[in-house]
């Protein structure tokens, strides 16, 4: 009997794959536990429609990430902070500060977890930050910290 897996099944296959199993295994284990459905023409069409929709969604997300990366190119994030005489900050600047700046100044909503800073920014100066927007798509930002 051919079935379509609804979840990954160890030793059998990945989610949404079409596999051939014995009738008893399908009727007594896979289908009752909700791990698979019988591979009828309607179910195969539903599976293909879902795969197509997922593919379109990923393409759309990739296009949006590339567009956002273009917008981020050339942006210099200038943050003001209180610092001591030797240029050492009272505290430090984080990816949240960079994210807040981009939201306020450029109306770009970027999650702070996507911004990776090379080192902790604890003194005045210029730093390079990388924004990971999508697997394989990232943008570089220049972060300047100036005396308040």
Curated annotation (Swiss-Prot):
GO CC annotation: ribonucleoprotein complex; ribosome
Domain of life (superkingdom): Bacteria
SUPFAM superfamilies: L9 N-domain-like (SSF55658), Ribosomal protein L9 C-domain (SSF55653)
The name this protein goes by in its record: Large ribosomal subunit protein bL9
GO process terms (BP): translation
Name of encoding gene: rplI
Biological role stated in the UniProt entry: Binds to the 23S rRNA.
Protein keywords: Ribonucleoprotein, Ribosomal protein, RNA-binding, rRNA-binding
One Pfam family hit: Ribosomal_L9_C
Organism: Acetivibrio thermocellus (strain ATCC 27405 / DSM 1237 / JCM 9322 / NBRC 103400 / NCIMB 10682 / NRRL B-4536 / VPI 7372) (Clostridium thermocellum)
NCBIfam families according to UniProt: L9 (TIGR00158)
Entry similarity comment: Belongs to the bacterial ribosomal protein bL9 family.
GO-annotated molecular function: rRNA binding; structural constituent of ribosome
């Amino acid at each position: 009997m051919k079935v379509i897996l609804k979840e990954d099944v160890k030793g059998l296959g990945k989610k949404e794959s079409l596999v051939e199993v014995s009738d008893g295994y399908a009727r007594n284990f896979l289908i009752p536990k909700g791990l698979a459905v019988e591979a009828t023409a309607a179910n195969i069409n539903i599976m293909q429609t879902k795969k197509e929709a997922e593919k379109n969604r990923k393409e759309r997300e990739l296009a949006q990430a590339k567009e956002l990366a273009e917008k981020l190119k050339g942006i210099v994030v200038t943050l003001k902070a209180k610092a001591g005489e030797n240029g050492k900050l009272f505290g430090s600047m984080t990816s949240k500060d960079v994210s807040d700046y981009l939201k306020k100044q450029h109306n770009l909503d970027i999650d702070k977890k996507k911004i990776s800073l090379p080192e902790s920014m604890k003194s005045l100066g210029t730093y390079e930050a990388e924004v990971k927007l999508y697997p394989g798509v990232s943008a570089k930002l220049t972060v300047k910290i100036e005396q308040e």
